[in-house]
């Protein structure tokens, strides 16, 4: 079971949303997992690639997933194609996923990528689409406050101001990093 604990009968259900599930035949490194965390994936010349970066025709210098063969992906369920109570395996391996105890399909709130929704301060949740349910991009980890989350993809179309670094670990020296920053229109002011 995914989203519940059980051997035979599910219990202790996960209270939240699951945007997609990936099953690998290889142990990925922490950096590889982070690289694809905020983007869907696709096959690119028999290797795994981040869909958002491909759509932008960007090949970042920090491409931690580029050496992982697509064939090592046993199952990929982006939860975007449903047939009754099943979800399609986008890995190409034909491992259809069965959805159980699902009462509703919610809108996608995963930051793929994070996107601005209005002019405002970077650290204000109202500046971001789904900012009320997602943490601010490029800020401190909610698990380890000595770690800055620097693997987010961010797309802005508004005037965004960064003038407060108080939520960053002191080791950052006031610097904020993200995996990819796309300023499609307007400006980011620091």
Kindly give the residue locations of the regions a language model identified.
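Acidic, glycine-rich loop-and-strand cores that form catalytic or ligand-binding grooves
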Residues: 20-32, 36-46
């Amino acid at each position: 079971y995914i989203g519940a604990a059980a051997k035979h009968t599910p219990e202790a259900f996960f209270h939240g949303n699951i945007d997609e599930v990936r099953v690998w035949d290889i142990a990925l490194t922490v950096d590889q997992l982070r690289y694809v965390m905020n983007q869907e994936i696709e096959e690119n010349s028999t290797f795994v690639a981040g869909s958002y970066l491909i759509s932008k025709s960007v090949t970042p210098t920090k491409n931690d997933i580029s050496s992982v063969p697509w064939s090592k992906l046993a199952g990929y369920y982006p939860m975007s194609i449903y047939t009754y109570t099943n979800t399609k395996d986008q890995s190409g391996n034909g491992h259809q996923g069965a959805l159980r105890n699902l009462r509703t399909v919610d809108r996608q709130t995963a930051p793929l990528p994070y996107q601005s929704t209005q002019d405002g301060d970077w650290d204000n949740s109202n500046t971001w689409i789904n900012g009320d349910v997602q943490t601010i991009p490029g800020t401190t980890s909610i698990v380890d406050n000595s770690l800055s989350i620097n693997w987010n993809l961010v797309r802005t179309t508004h005037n965004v101001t960064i003038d407060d670094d108080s939520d960053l670990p002191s080791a950052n020296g006031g610097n904020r990093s993200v995996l990819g920053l796309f300023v499609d229109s307007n400006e980011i002011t620091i």
